């Protein structure tokens, strides 16, 4: 049985090194691996001994914490319906018969959409308070950055197409988008910002060199969006440090997207994650491989902020944006007549929808290398609900 356990854990640890694919699980034996300190010798007394003091029971460890999520499995968390203008119909030929001014409930294209890519990279200081070489209470303080990519449907990219309203009266018409632009890509680059986490880990059961342990962790950060890219044929644009409207319904203010826009706020994402895990390790001299399972929940909430495409406040050369013509047929309508704007996308906007975990369960495999019972380096890989790698280097005082 011992040989089988050794083989499984060693194989898992070696596999993690060749398939590095949030919050780490960590070695369940970590509270008891470093039993000596660089300044003070460790104490292996009995906690039931009346002569033992808390000074004998407590120790500190510090080190580096690096966590690198290459792909978090996320999906949107939105309602099934979305409020916007009525969709064009087959009776709208040269242009819309009636321009949309009233919101109607339409199927939400963002509902249940999966994100194509979600990355997050964290570098932090690690501090742990150890009790009786069995329990750890720890925290991390550092910085995180990230990247999100998804189909434009996940972000409710919409615009107005086919309007018959003339440009001279467009600003006062209070029109709303009627077309969902679902065949495009949206990218979000997240700036580097402060991040923290807290947790606890316990070695619950030991038998020889095997240790069964459990941990619980919580992490939080609130980064801002550094750059927003919309890769869409009908309306392509990039915004550095985007701003938008929180809780705003259509129609947006006609100044939205211009330098004169007011009432906007920076686009930021409130990140929360908590995780519970159970893991088994087996010590082989200076190596301690382990394998664990985890259950976690993560959310990215941007308050459903609505961001408008950048545009000019006043038309230059009869245009306020560089959106291309869409229909590609017929003659160009002269300025000052109906349908002069019908063939280009107008008042384009998107919103940053709330996202959450698409899968809650995952596995982790890793190994810890201990030197002189004072220093340790842990390498870990996580799979299923995310593809991630973790590195932790620490020493005991």
UniProtKB/Swiss-Prot annotation:
One of its GO terms (molecular function) is structural molecule activity. Its main location: membrane. The keyword Disulfide bond applies. One of its GO terms (biological process) is monoatomic ion transport. GO terms for cellular component: cell outer membrane; pore complex. Keywords: Cell outer membrane, Cell shape, Disulfide bond, Ion transport, Membrane, Porin, Signal, Transmembrane, Transmembrane beta strand, Transport. It is found in: Cell outer membrane. InterPro entries: Major_OMP_Chlamydia (IPR000604). In elementary bodies (EBs, the infectious stage, which is able to survive outside the host cell) provides the structural integrity of the outer envelope through disulfide cross-links with the small cysteine-rich protein and the large cysteine-rich periplasmic protein. It has been described in publications as the Sarkosyl-insoluble COMC (Chlamydia outer membrane complex), and serves as the functional equivalent of peptidoglycan. Permits diffusion of specific solutes through the outer membrane. Part of a disulfide cross-linked outer membrane complex (COMC) composed of the major outer membrane porin (MOMP), the small cysteine-rich protein (OmcA) and the large cysteine-rich periplasmic protein (OmcB). This is Major outer membrane porin, serovar C.
